[in-house]
Design a protein with these regions (language model features):
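Carbohydrate-interacting/catalytic domains
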Residues: 1-155
């Protein structure tokens, strides 16, 4: 059928043997990353649903930015799609999609690294494959009366 996906040669349906023991010995295993991502997914109700996906603008097509939100749980992901090169971009957030006002600056906690940044509407990111291929941010609403620092933190 014209325009349909061909399953026979589709990479996503192929089984590929992985030498997990060798990857562990060589320090190239992705098992800890997969384990961490599964832990993050279980901890965030926003990641349990399929229909709450919102994309945000990046000025580099090699990076993708999207968020998922359920109630007060907001997760923002920025990922490098280039497995070979470091990529940089300015991310422009659709603040209302995050449940925020356009002018707000909020703490975002990277669930992969443990680091916290303050992000506003526009933010600079630099992601290196093999070291920091993505950010998985938990967007934290500041408590009432907390000072707003403003500005975008580099990551």
């Amino acid at each position: 059928r014209d325009g349909s996906e061909e399953y026979l040669d589709s990479e996503k349906y192929q089984l590929k043997p992985r030498d997990w023991a060798r990857a562990e010995r060589e320090g190239t295993t992705i098992a800890p990353l997969i384990t961490r991502l599964n832990t993050i997914r279980r901890a965030h109700p926003a990641l349990h649903r399929l229909r709450n996906l919102r994309f945000h603008h990046t000025d580099n097509d090699a990076l993708i930015a999207y968020s998922k939100r359920v109630g007060s749980d907001v997760v923002l992901v920025v990922a490098n799609l280039d497995p070979h090169r470091t990529q940089e971009a300015t991310i422009s957030l659709d603040m209302p999609q995050l449940g925020l006002d356009w002018h707000e600056s909020v703490p975002v906690h990277d669930e992969l690294t443990g680091r916290t940044y303050h992000w506003g509407r526009t933010n600079y990111v630099r992601l290196e494959p093999g070291r920091a291929p993505a950010h998985v941010f938990h967007v934290r609403r500041p408590s009432a009366g907390a000072p707003q620092n403003g500005g975008a933190g580099a990551s």
